[in-house]
């Protein structure tokens, strides 16, 4: 069966995803200058443009030849605000020093304070980059990134042979001093966990920054980080509840829906997940504060019966609407009315008086007023458009999803 694939490229400037960037000085034993970080990429951006954003984000400046648009070569990274540019060759890995000596290269105290660039420490040094574990034979300005790409900007002291990229400088595949592990997955996990604010274990960071770590050690470190990432994703509902509770803020009557939403989300968690909600005490305190606020409210309400069809000695049901206003909070409840009681059948979502029942205690009328109440009429009555006012005194039981109920005397004006 034939398939047709239609390719529609993103427009320039359109967000296309995230790449992972790191800046490394492993050849000097100095670890990361910039740990792996997720960075946004946009259609039309070359790797040079993204690199410039990363450097600026972390307070670095740079010097380069060519331009971002073409022929870009990163010459030097300079310390703008963060004093972590390596300036001493004393921590270079011993095996690398031995390999360099076979080339007749000795690392020297030849550098500029707070910057790192080409020809520092030896004549074969400079900046290179690998993209998805391959050192391209084109410059930054000629590489265009896709979502999920891993870009590792690395300092070399041997034309790339010390970091696994000697072939990019025109050498053969066997010009590398030692086997170099693929650290793309590990770099991606470090960037992801950093984004989550999760601390990277020392063992994993050591494997990431050791220039000649074995692939087995790198894979083991990635497995540890993957477990941390899996746990983070599994606890997404916990973080959602924590965020909902934090969003409650100072409690007022307007907080009722936010508190109810946080409570509902918390109750939906497993017992194990509930134990991880670090601010649960904030929720219970908010619930108690709201309960007190509701208890203290003076409650007034009015309702109307649009039409009386028939009244006799038998109980009849007339649909009415009850609206109550508590300061800035408006509640609407649809109820069914009969000659003995008012009972809430349905509550509009978000109403404070949820699950409330209202029972007629007493009623007062003026002579000649047609009314509906707990009575047995002597004869059937009919009427349309009740114009007279009838004052009913009722008792409301307030139960806003909290423990305990509070009786409140309510004067209800019925039109």
Description of each model-found segment:
Residues 1-233:
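Ubiquitin-like/PB1-type beta-grasp interaction modules and other compact soluble beta-rich domains
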Residues 4, 12-23, 238, 242, ...:
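Boundary/junction segments of secreted and surface-exposed precursor proteins
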Residues 21, 189, 193, 204, ...:
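Extracellular/surface recognition and adhesion modules
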Residues 23-27, 54, 133, 155-157, ...:
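A mature extracytoplasmic/lumenal domain signature
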Residues 110-114, 242-255:
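Short, charged low-complexity linear motifs
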Residues 138, 238-244, 258, 292:
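N-terminal exported-region signature
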Residues 195-232, 248-287:
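Amphipathic, non-membrane alpha-helical rod segments
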Residues 263, 292-415:
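Acidic, low-complexity intrinsically disordered segments
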């Amino acid at each position: 069966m034939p398939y047709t694939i239609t390719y529609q490229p993103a427009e320039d400037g359109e967000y296309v995803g995230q790449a992972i960037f790191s800046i490394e000085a492993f050849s000097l034993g100095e670890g990361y200058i910039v740990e792996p970080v997720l960075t946004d990429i946009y259609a039309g951006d070359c790797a040079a443009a993204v690199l410039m954003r990363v450097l600026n984000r972390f307070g670095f400046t740079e010097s380069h030849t060519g331009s971002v648009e073409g022929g870009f070569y990163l010459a030097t990274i300079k310390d703008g605000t963060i004093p972590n540019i390596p300036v001493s060759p004393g921590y270079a890995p011993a095996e690398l020093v031995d390999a360099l000596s076979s080339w007749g290269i000795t690392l020297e105290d030849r550098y500029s304070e707070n910057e790192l660039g080409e020809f520092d420490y030896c004549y074969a040094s400079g900046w290179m980059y690998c993209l998805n574990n391959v050192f391209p034979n084109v410059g930054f300005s000629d590489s265009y990134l896709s979502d999920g790409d891993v870009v590792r900007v690395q300092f070399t002291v041997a034309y790339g042979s010390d970091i696994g990229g000697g072939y990019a400088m025109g050498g053969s595949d066997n010009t590398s001093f030692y086997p170099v592990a693929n650290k793309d997955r590990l770099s991606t996990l470090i960037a992801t966990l950093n984004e989550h604010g999760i601390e990277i274990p020392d063992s994993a960071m050591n494997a990431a920054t050791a220039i000649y770590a074995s692939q087995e050690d790198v894979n083991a470190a990635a497995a540890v980080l993957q477990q941390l990432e899996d746990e983070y994703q599994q606890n997404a509902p916990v973080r959602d509840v924590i965020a909902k509770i934090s969003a409650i803020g100072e409690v007022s009557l307007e907080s009722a829906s936010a508190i109810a939403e946080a409570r509902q989300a918390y109750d939906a968690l497993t017992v194990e997940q509930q134990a991880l909600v670090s601010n649960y005490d904030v929720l219970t305190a908010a619930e108690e504060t709201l309960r007190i606020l509701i208890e203290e409210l003076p409650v007034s309400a009015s309702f109307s019966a649009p039409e009386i069809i028939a009244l006799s000695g038998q109980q009849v049901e007339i649909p009415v609407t009850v609206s109550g206003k508590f300061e800035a909070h408006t509640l609407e409840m649809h109820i069914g009315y009969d000659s003995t009681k008012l009972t809430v059948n349905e509550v509009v979502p978000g109403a404070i008086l949820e699950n409330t029942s209202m029972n007629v205690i007493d009623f007062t009328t003026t002579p000649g007023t047609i009314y509906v109440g707990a009575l047995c009429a002597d004869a059937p009555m009919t009427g349309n458009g009740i114009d007279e006012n009838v004052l009913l005194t009722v008792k409301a039981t307030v139960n806003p999803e909290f423990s305990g109920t509070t009786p409140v005397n309510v004067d209800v004006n019925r039109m």
